[in-house]
Amino acid sequence: MTDAKYVLCRWGKRLWPAKVLARTETSAKNKKKKEFFLDVQILSLKEKIQVKSSAVEALQKSHIENIAAFLASQNEVPATPLEELTYRRSLRVALDVLNERTSLSPESHPIEDGITLSQKEKTDADVASQVSSAPSPSLLGEDGQAVVAQCASKRRSEYSSKSLLPSSALEDHLRCQVGPKTGLSESGAGDKSQDDSGLQLDHGQESTTKKRQRNLGEKPTRRRRSESGLSKGESVLKSQGQASSCVALASPRPPSQTRDEEPCAGVKGCDWVKSSGNIRPLSASERSRGCPTKRPRLDGGQNPPTRQLGTRTVGAAPCPRSCSGEVTMLCSAGAGDKPEEDPVSSEESTGFKSTHSLLEEEEEEEEEPPRILLYHEPRSFEVGMLVWLKYQKYPFWPAVVKSVRRRDKKASVLFIEGNMNPKGRGITVSLRRLKHFDCKEKHALLDRAKEDFAQAIGWCVSLITDYRVRLGCGSFAGSFLEYYAADISYPVRKSIQQDVLGTRFPQLGKGDPEEPVGDSQLGQWRPCRKVLPDRSRAARDRANQKLVEYIVKAKGAESHLRAILHSRKPSRWLKTFLSSSQCVTCMETYLEDEAQLDEVVEYLQGVCRDMDGQVPERGSGDRIRFILDVLLPEAIICAISAVEAVDYKTAEQKYIRGPTLSYREKEIFDNELLEERNRRRR
């Protein structure tokens, strides 16, 4: 544990991957047990901690996969979003470090000829102990044909990554291995001293060979390595000009062991049998009971045996239950024949080159990141989602899903605008017309919207970004519409609301709220939805009528006005009137109906005539201004206090605030201003 460079330690409440910086040995009571302290640094963080060597584990890829699976199975995030992202980024860095170390390990690179076997490859000792000395293998048979070289795959995947051993080490191994780290140049020497003895295989390996065949079938990565190694071997053979000789790699075995050791002995589909310690090709009758007869070549000969790459073959179908991963090559000419170019071999070499290039492309592909770091676009639409929607002639625009009707496959959405009403109903559209906000076409949709509405779409994106940032840091928890209506979004909303006259938004959702006109069939008449008038103004007028009746008919404010004129009650309105020298051209009257305002002003004029001697000298000179600046506010405040049963201060504050306008009234007023501005520009 103390030799590991990367460990898995507990920090806080989680297991974090860390890098070992230093090791410190401490004295323990028991001298036989040594205790170490490790100074480690959390990956992707600058946090450095000290842990005991007994409390850590060597970092392995399986640890990262188990943690990722555990995080994916959790329904709720145990920490804040920012801490969760930091933790997952640390896991990602740890996984990259492990993959990089695997790619740079000695077993992942080919070993040059002549380099001795590494000490770390002692795992083959139990297999090499079963090997006995024997004559060197031969390359040619009795009939001048090439002999098959069948190499059994090794037990584990790391065996397939070991390099080809030199000739002195061949006696210590059970079989030759052709993989991505194996070269065939050594076996392609073609010494004539090896042309006198038959090919012999190991004893007692038939059962283990079958097991390895199944293992190879379950792991396609081994097949990929074998294919790559075979392609490299072909290139070496061609470079040495051995077009008329066959290369067969096998460990030397005594003849007495060959029959029991033959991997394909007793198995249908093999084209070679053992006879008197040698291997001979099957006859036509014997071959008719085994593998199908080979197709005749165009030049009258027989096709060479198939080259088997794992479970895939090049040029012919594989023999059933044949040794997967073994390499079978046949000479195209005998010892006395003249070497001539084989038209089929050129096709096969082209196939090998294409296969080799495909394998290299597969190995060079970037590794897919873990699931926890990938964004998966949701398949369905939920309430509160941010989407794109195209409305009429305008480009796609961001919107919020307010409600979803699964049975009708429709959703009610609300476009994001500068004067958006979060409580608005929105428009109903088909789910097929919606696109997720983070879809693949997001940048294209943004560019299209910026062509005509650059400032407006920029503000929408800023609003959405601010909402997501506040969700991530935990300063806000809720839907987008709740965020828009809350005070926390005011800084972003203020930037566009202050410039509402200068920012042009598309006229979205102004037509039929059920379906856009773009979906209707040509020439089909669709009834227009009747928009009800705004009732807010009428409700305020009815409430103000009670104030007018209290002032005019009941004369409830007359005693209050006389007390102010006689200076028995203080009045801020009278004090402001006497101290101000400017003429106010616009004032807030609180009463919105002109008839109600005229009725109250006419009554106050009568009060001034009755109290002519009590009106201040300044008020006598400008009686209309005195009535509007002093008597009208005092009369309305007194009426509000009496009708609504509140004190004078509360009634005064309500008068100063003025009437509460609805969202539709503000929208109508803004549209009127825009129309007036456009009319003046023309």
UniProtKB/Swiss-Prot annotation:
Name listed for the protein in its UniProt record: PWWP domain-containing DNA repair factor 3A
Q: Where is the composition biased (Low complexity)?
A: 127-140
The family annotation for this protein states: Belongs to the PWWP3A family.
Please give the chief subcellular localization of this protein. nucleus
Provide the residue span(s) of the region labelled Disordered: 121-145, 179-318, 334-369
- Keyword field: DNA damage, DNA repair, Nucleus, Phosphoprotein
Question: What biological-process terms (Gene Ontology) are attached?
Answer: chromatin organization; DNA repair
Mention any Pfam family matching this sequence: PWP3A-B_N
The Gene Ontology terms for molecular function here are: nucleosome binding
Q: Ranges of Basic and acidic residues compositional bias?
A: 203-220
Gene behind this chain?
A: Pwwp3a
